[in-house]
Amino acid sequence: MSTNQELVDEFIATRGLSKASYKSFKYTLKHYSNFQGCSLQELLDEADYEEEQGIRWKKRKLKQRLTNYMNFCRNTLTINTAKHYLKVVKIFYHHHDIEIHKLPPFNERNAKVRNPITPKDLPIREILQEAVEIAEPLMKALILFLVSSGMSKVDARNLTIQNFLDATSKYHNNSEDLKTAIKLMKEYDGEIIPIWNSRRQKTNKFFVTFNTDEATRHIISYLELRNERLNKNFYNPKNELGPSDKLFKIGVDYFSVKFKELNDTLNLGTAGGNPEENIKGFTRLRAHMLRKYHATNLKKFGMDTYTINVLQGKSNGAVNDVYFFEDEETLLAEYIKAIEGVLILTDVKDYNRYSPEYIKMEKENEEYKEKIDKITDEINVLKKMYRGET
């Protein structure tokens, strides 16, 4: 007979889930097993036996167990968490070829709900400035990157040194050596705005986004520090970072811990909780809130929702996703127009956003606009002539 751990490990391995999903699924299945007072193997054997005996669904213990568990979760958890737990349990049964027929619908009346997170819950620029000021080099770079790129923590953690070299290639002549690339970028007279061609782990959707020069400079400082530490570590045969190394060296658990430490140090508290129903809130300074900050502030400074969705790797609808492809340079121009919204340490008046590429792009846009205006004027003249107005 397999233990709970063995069943969970086999279940997770065949589905190819991430470390974070592994922990979530493991906790949920343990929660279900404890509620039922049986091991997962005993629950599977019971369901399998009932199925082989041809017992009708409405009389099966499995239906009663799932219904009872659903009601328990609804009464003790938020409605979204309750639905997620039941979904995981059903997936587990399906994975072991156990049939599950129709269950009673979730009764959402009087269900526990979180208070909505509102714009006032987002950390303001001054708070983020304080956070960056007191943070260690890794967190300085990470905060500025997440705020200005809008990437999720999962996608940011997946980035490699090679991804960084690719994103900044035009600033270091496509150098494949990190130290050489950093040297050239530090000598570059202008703003370094990387172009990230990435893919969301959550949806497998490819997307393009950018980050600010201040984020790039702090990433460079952080990478130099890591290389320096590698050089001083005599027990490590590796003396510099390679293309396959992670851009941000931080585990999923440590990621949350470091943000919570900063949140607590700044006394930011939580958001989205509901004390009356004993629902704890989320820390205000966390990766997802920085993603919200990115979207909210780009919109505040003139960027449309469609473009924001593109930068965050979100869908703009099935038809748009299939038939419309976003041009990197056009997106970059839109990003630079709204960049003030995601600058944390730099005032926009001091920000030389007119890089050589941008100046060229702006000039071409002006010339294009002049041509359009001229054509429009000519069309209007022809219309008047046709009507006999001239």
Question: Which residues does each PLM region occupy?
Answer:
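DNA breakage-rejoining catalytic core of tyrosine-based enzymes
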Residues: 59, 111-130, 203-217, 230
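Conserved tyrosine-mediated DNA breakage-rejoining catalytic core shared by Y-recombinases
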Residues: 159-218
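Short, polar N-cap/turn motifs at the start of nucleic acid-interacting alpha helices
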Residues: 165-166, 282-284, 301-327
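Active-site/catalytic core of tyrosine-dependent DNA strand-transfer enzymes
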Residues: 212-282
